[in-house]
Amino acid sequence: PATGYYEWPVIDGVKRPHYIALADSPVMLFGGLWETRPDGAGGWLSTYSIVTREADPVIAPVHDRMPLILPPDMHRDWLHGSADEAMAMAHAAPEPALVFHEVDKAVGNVRNQGKQLIAPIPSGTSALFP
């Protein structure tokens, strides 16, 4: 589960971080794929990827792609279904109700932690929508 995710659109030639979250839920679940394979040194390597889709109209000004966000009624089937079922769910998943706001650039440094990283910047608005 995640509470949201970040995108960094370029606005007036400057990358500006935005936090994106569900409008109607404190958590979301992304569709993802994983595999475990030999690492070539006698061990195993576990890898994963978050599935993306074309951005919905709300997020399109921020980025042209977005994670596949699964509604709660699809969680169990995604985790326990077949690859064919996952593909069908990816195409059938509804567009989620999302909100976003610009956040401080401190989010770009992995040493920074805390709730302040998802807080709106003091101006309270995004340059995408003055």
Q: Predicted regions span which residues?
A:
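Short linear sequence motif anchored by a di-proline
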Residues: 1-130
